[in-house]
Amino acid sequence: MDTKMTEREKMTKGLMYDPGDEELCKGRTEARQLIHRFNNSMDKLERKDITKQLFGSTGEKIYLEPTLRVDYGYNIHVGENFYANFGAIFLDICPITIGKNAMLAPNVQLYSATHPIDPTERNSGLEFGKPITIGDNAWIGGGAIILPGVTLGDNVVVGSGAVVTRSFGSNVVIAGNPAKVIKEIPVKSE
């Protein structure tokens, strides 16, 4: 029995993989074709349909503004009532999972892709990634950058321009470069 993983399987699991693999090149090309249609459509229902084809999973109520950029799309999972403003970038070589009622302001960048620190390894052309997870009710401010391996809990607010280099729990406002907790968010009981 052959248990050899494909480059796509390695990529999605966060292992070193070859981005020049034929299947991965085809996946990026297919994603770019869908993105081109999305970014040039004036019809919001058509854009929603394209998003549902492109993303791995979505809630029913989603809205994304053009322009949108992704690597593959199939590693992006967004919950119900998701909104992304203009210029969202998803480098989705590993899963990017976003909960329900989440909002991305303009030019938010989510990078699950990374490269080896060692120059010899980096020059080999192999890459790897780390998943990004964002909880329910998150609001990511304009121009924020979320780096590989970050997990943000529920009800997190990320200030505009923040560079999020590490994970944070629920109910906090974070901002800065690198991002740090600015304040805790009191949660009202229902």
Curated annotation (Swiss-Prot):
EC number: 2.3.1.-
Keyword tRNA-binding: no
Transferase is among the record's keywords: yes
SUPFAM superfamilies to which the protein is assigned, alphabetical: Trimeric LpxA-like enzymes
Pfam families: Hexapep, Mac
Enzyme class: transferase
GO molecular function term, any single one: acetyltransferase activity
Keywords: Acyltransferase, Transferase
CDD domains found in the cross-reference section: LbH_MAT_GAT
Similarity section: Belongs to the transferase hexapeptide repeat family.
Protein name, UniProt field: Putative acetyltransferase DDB_G0275913
